[in-house]
Amino acid sequence: MKKKNNIILTIQKNCKNTKNIPKKYIFEKWIKKVLYKKKNVNLINIRIVDEREMKNINLKYRGKNKSTNILSFKFDLFINKNQTLLGDLVLCKKIIEKESLKYQKTLESRWAHMIIHGTLHLLGYDHKNKKEKKIMEKIENKIMLFLNYEKPYFMKSS
């Protein structure tokens, strides 16, 4: 029997303005598209923060004294035979809003892309070199198109 819901999602909002943050079921929809092959129940925590908190977290964990759009903290902690804590996604609302304008994407599309990108990191994907980056971007493009959003990356056809 197929499991109906393969994620347990908690969301913390730690920013003054919570307007235009997607609803929990929307986050779940995006994450499920990334985790569609996973059989376990996967626990993910999302924390939505302001630029100051993001800057502090980025400095503490990556040594970078600036805010960023998303940080992923992979745990992949086996809780029991049916549950895995995949990790945490920390998103900066203000930067996502700025980037949606900068890249001329809808705000919803930018949120979707960041959640997909972060969830792929929780699964072990990365973009530290050209080969990894190409693989990850191809998956992100495919999922975004499947969800009826524009490609976040415009890739040259090979």
From Swiss-Prot:
Cofactor binding, per record: Binds 1 zinc ion.
GO terms for MF: metalloendopeptidase activity; RNA endonuclease activity; zinc ion binding
Family listed: Belongs to the endoribonuclease YbeY family.
Primary site of residence: cytoplasm
Keyword Nuclease: yes
UniProt xrefs under InterPro entries: MetalPrtase_cat_dom_sf_prd, YbeY, YbeY_CS
Entry superkingdom: Bacteria
Family annotation (SUPFAM superfamilies): Metalloproteases ('zincins'), catalytic domain
Keywords: Cytoplasm, Endonuclease, Hydrolase, Metal-binding, Nuclease, Ribosome biogenesis, rRNA processing, Zinc
Enzyme class: hydrolase
Catalytic activity, EC: 3.1.-.-
Subcellular compartments: Cytoplasm
Protein known as: Endoribonuclease YbeY
GO biological process: rRNA processing
Keyword presence, Nuclease: yes
Cofactor(s) listed in the protein's UniProt record: Zn(2+)
Annotated PANTHER family: ENDORIBONUCLEASE YBEY, CHLOROPLASTIC
